[in-house]
Amino acid sequence: MPLALNRFPIEILRMIFDYFWAHEILYMFFNINDHFNRILFAYDQYRINFQSIRKTHFDLVCRLIRPEQVISLILADQKQTPCQSQLFQTLFRIEKFTRLRSLKLIELADDGQSLLSKLYKLQRLVSLEINIRFDLPLIKALPPIKTLIINLPSDVQFDIRRSIGSLSLEYVRHLSISYCSFGAFLHFFNEMPQLKSFKTSLFLWKPMEVNLFAYIHKIQITPVDLVSLSLTIDAPALELTNHHFELFLTPFQRLQQFELIIKTYLDHEFLNANHWEKLIVEHLPKLMTFNFKFPASFDEREIIDRFRSPFWLNKHWFVAFDSQSQRLFTVPHFASTETRNSIQSVSSDWTTLPLEQHSIFYDRVNQLKYESGQSEHPYRYNHVKKLIFNDPYMYDNIVDLSKIKTAMPCVNYLRLNCSQTSLRNKYFPDISLPQIRRLSLPQFGRRKEKIQFNWSKVFPCVERLTASINSKNQIVFLIDHFNNMLDGFFVLDEYHFDKIKITREWLKQHSCRLKREKKENGFACEINDKYSFSLCLWMSENK
């Protein structure tokens, strides 16, 4: 096989490499022979994705790749990869990545401050994405980037202009910010004349701001050449009207994609399909995609029926009404990806989607939650990846668990929100679920007495584990019991208030698996014990 691969032209191999991440390329092709190693060492288009990566793959990439070979980099200090950015910065200096074009920072421990202050040196950087953990550091200078994405925590709000207000943003063409105040909204529109796509959640707290939003084009310069616009708007109840949006949208004659989510109560006239049709035909001639989700409370089928006109059906802009969530939305774009055991069939009275396409409502579901007293599901969810059991009497539903292999072949995440006493071997006869790679046990630490249960028999291939604990010994037990575990997140159970103090050295001394690790950085851990206790662990494969 290596001899046959040697006949491949280098140009073809480089084209193949362009479809894979750096760790995938190195894992597949490194050390096949000297010829391939020379190709790998000369390749200069590596895209590194360290999000949720295996520790061994992280080490492989850091060992073999030089900074000047990298054009894209993703760093993440998430639960699955604690202390990653710190490890990375002990090996590399970001300013050495002279060919870097795209950078994504995900929940870094210092929110990226140590890296962001040096990005102005990377003159080839055109795309920057930051997922903030706590706060966005002050960014004084950036190269002339074209794409800027800032994802903020949902429970943290601040004026983003404090961090990026002094930046020159004239070259930005694509902007996405989780949320912004109306003042920040005005700032971005004024400072980005070349903007082509914009996505944000906008808070209009006062009726005056709603009016200013509508008349923004008369107040200041705006990027009327927008091609893609995605807005989530929260405003005082019943303040937003069709007229406001007609004034706001009319200048965007080149708009091709439009997504609109409204979170506040609306007048029924806002849901009038005829009005939206008139607005689009007269002022948005290039619009190809229109997705929306509006709060709605109505019993009249007339509102749905207006969306059955040839205009909507010919464009395949189908809508549906969900009486439980009280939402009117486009499908399949906003069709739910999660469901509980109380799912009901979708009536044609409440959707314009053709009957033969109703399977979309079930095929899009990738998370299924079983509640107590679960009855059989009337539908087969072939694409479910996450399965959640919220049932204190787990053994009543083991028959459903045993069907996972055949009925839900895509499931790889399982959450068992039930007491340990419900998890006994006699309730799991001959069940083995090697497809489960991510396991969550939120009540594992609820009881102190030892429960005899063969976890490795039922879940032999778990790689990512989340569990509550009530002692240090439970952490060691779980690390050593799940032989294939690559990362773990352990949190002190809410019913146990005993302080847990633990160190990296203690873990290595008491865990048989970690004790066998010879490399100094063979595993990484982040211990948080200031107020409560949690431990993030990132390990190499068990040898």
For the regions a protein language model found, what residue spans apply to each?
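Eukaryote-biased activation of long, low-complexity terminal tails and linkers
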Residues: 1-543
